[in-house]
Amino acid sequence: MNTQQLAKLRSIVPEMRRVRHIHFVGIGGAGMGGIAEVLANEGYQISGSDLAPNPVTQQLMNLGATIYFNHRPENVRDASVVVVSSAISADNPEIVAAHEARIPVIRRAEMLAELMRFRHGIAIAGTHGKTTTTAMVSSIYAEAGLDPTFVNGGLVKAAGVHARLGHGRYLIAEADESDASFLHLQPMVAIVTNIEADHMDTYQGDFENLKQTFINFLHNLPFYGRAVMCVDDPVIRELLPRVGRQTTTYGFSEDADVRVEDYQQIGPQGHFTLLRQDKEPMRVTLNAPGRHNALNAAAAVAVATEEGIDDEAILRALESFQGTGRRFDFLGEFPLEPVNGKSGTAMLVDDYGHHPTEVDATIKAARAGWPDKNLVMLFQPHRFTRTRDLYDDFANVLTQVDTLLMLEVYPAGEAPIPGADSRSLCRTIRGRGKIDPILVPDPAQVAEMLAPVLIGNDLILVQGAGNIGKIARSLAEIKLKPQTPEEEQHD
């Protein structure tokens, strides 16, 4: 951003008083890095720490940020404020040092709230679909020439970044309920895609507590704000009478204000009609598969229509939508060496979904778009607590594929829980009598154990939120071919 553009922005968005140097602890996370990127482009001095480099930290370093790949007290020296990820413990040496030096320590969402304070904020919340819906809203507003600022939890592929500083008055942001920190946000418009039991440790295992927190989030809207909510979701339908703000509903349901009709999926695209009150029907081609993505698009269209964005811009944005990183992310179609006397190709798709509802939606999209493919899933459960709490749901959903390979649970810092491990889950699924899952004890064995189950007309779904995305990329790099020890050593 040049000096003239920055001066224009300053006339719209005042600087945070006396704040010059902002330090992020856990800066390599997508959400943290996105906020840091926006602030770097606004002209603030950015530093941060994390344990290992990744594309997020590299992008920030390219913008002039100072990144430390350790956690040491001296890293926070001279910082005006320290922003902390929810994954960072209170005894982190940088947090301790900041408190001792009386440097303010705030959560990620508090800084996001400051970015939103002087802008027209649009916040996207919900258990599933937040990242994709945020990208869709951002794409529509950009196509309409409104040049929004956006902060997303995943890579917006069209932009090549998780976040971008725009010159317009809009800030579009993913709102995270996992630690209830979205309560810091005060947007003008809020989307809620759905509400399910997840991150229940935050809510003391009480689903009513989670539901009330979503109500409180919506009541952060001004009285003239608007809540856009998916009426197909039974919990949202239950909560609607308790929302004391203007609402717009969307969904496949007949009573939705923005209704999806005549949905058809052809390969990676969805085709459907949107019916809106007092507007002409909109025939949509969406460059993203699955009924769940049609719902995400309906939410984005509801917000854009309310803002008065013309239909042509909306339709262009949805037809050219490039998606987000690790959300039904097509990594390639690769020729196979003859296996079991057969040759052919296998498609490779990487997906972040790690809740049974998300996994189910991904499987349904794959079946609808490629009904004749042999559907092979490589799944990595995420967190022992989630595996325990949703054990039966996982067992039911995972039986829908033709072949299942399962990695060990990605712990995300949790201690193992007896009976909530991958071996137990495989045993339970096997007992259902539909498929015979294969446990992959070592990620290095994935390509070797995958090859024999391919038939030459395959769609491979690499599914999960842990480090499985790296495995997906490595499979693409080696074109699904198991490597010999000599090849691995050469690499």
Curated annotation (Swiss-Prot):
<dbReference type="Pfam" id="PF02875">
    <property type="entry name" value="Mur_ligase_C"/>
</dbReference>
<dbReference type="GO" id="GO:0008763">
    <property type="term" value="F:UDP-N-acetylmuramate-L-alanine ligase activity"/>
</dbReference>
<dbReference type="InterPro" id="IPR050061">
    <property type="entry name" value="MurCDEF_pg_biosynth"/>
</dbReference>
<keyword id="KW-0961">Cell wall biogenesis/degradation</keyword>
<dbReference type="Pfam" id="PF08245">
    <property type="entry name" value="Mur_ligase_M"/>
</dbReference>
<keyword id="KW-0963">Cytoplasm</keyword>
<dbReference type="InterPro" id="IPR005758">
    <property type="entry name" value="UDP-N-AcMur_Ala_ligase_MurC"/>
</dbReference>
<dbReference type="GO" id="GO:0009252">
    <property type="term" value="P:peptidoglycan biosynthetic process"/>
</dbReference>
<dbReference type="InterPro" id="IPR036615">
    <property type="entry name" value="Mur_ligase_C_dom_sf"/>
</dbReference>
<keyword id="KW-0132">Cell division</keyword>
<dbReference type="InterPro" id="IPR000713">
    <property type="entry name" value="Mur_ligase_N"/>
</dbReference>
<keyword id="KW-0131">Cell cycle</keyword>
<protein>
    <recommendedName>
        <fullName>UDP-N-acetylmuramate--L-alanine ligase</fullName>
        <ecNumber>6.3.2.8</ecNumber>
    </recommendedName>
</protein>
<dbReference type="InterPro" id="IPR013221">
    <property type="entry name" value="Mur_ligase_cen"/>
</dbReference>
<dbReference type="GO" id="GO:0005737">
    <property type="term" value="C:cytoplasm"/>
</dbReference>
<keyword id="KW-0436">Ligase</keyword>
<comment type="pathway">
    <text>Cell wall biogenesis; peptidoglycan biosynthesis.</text>
</comment>
<keyword id="KW-0067">ATP-binding</keyword>
<keyword id="KW-0573">Peptidoglycan synthesis</keyword>
<keyword id="KW-0133">Cell shape</keyword>
<dbReference type="GO" id="GO:0005524">
    <property type="term" value="F:ATP binding"/>
</dbReference>
<comment type="similarity">
    <text>Belongs to the MurCDEF family.</text>
</comment>
<keyword id="KW-0547">Nucleotide-binding</keyword>
<dbReference type="GO" id="GO:0008360">
    <property type="term" value="P:regulation of cell shape"/>
</dbReference>
<feature type="binding site">
    <location>
        <begin position="126"/>
        <end position="132"/>
    </location>
    <ligand>
        <name>ATP</name>
    </ligand>
</feature>
<comment type="function">
    <text>Cell wall formation.</text>
</comment>
<dbReference type="InterPro" id="IPR004101">
    <property type="entry name" value="Mur_ligase_C"/>
</dbReference>
<dbReference type="InterPro" id="IPR036565">
    <property type="entry name" value="Mur-like_cat_sf"/>
</dbReference>
<dbReference type="GO" id="GO:0051301">
    <property type="term" value="P:cell division"/>
</dbReference>
<dbReference type="Pfam" id="PF01225">
    <property type="entry name" value="Mur_ligase"/>
</dbReference>
<dbReference type="GO" id="GO:0071555">
    <property type="term" value="P:cell wall organization"/>
</dbReference>
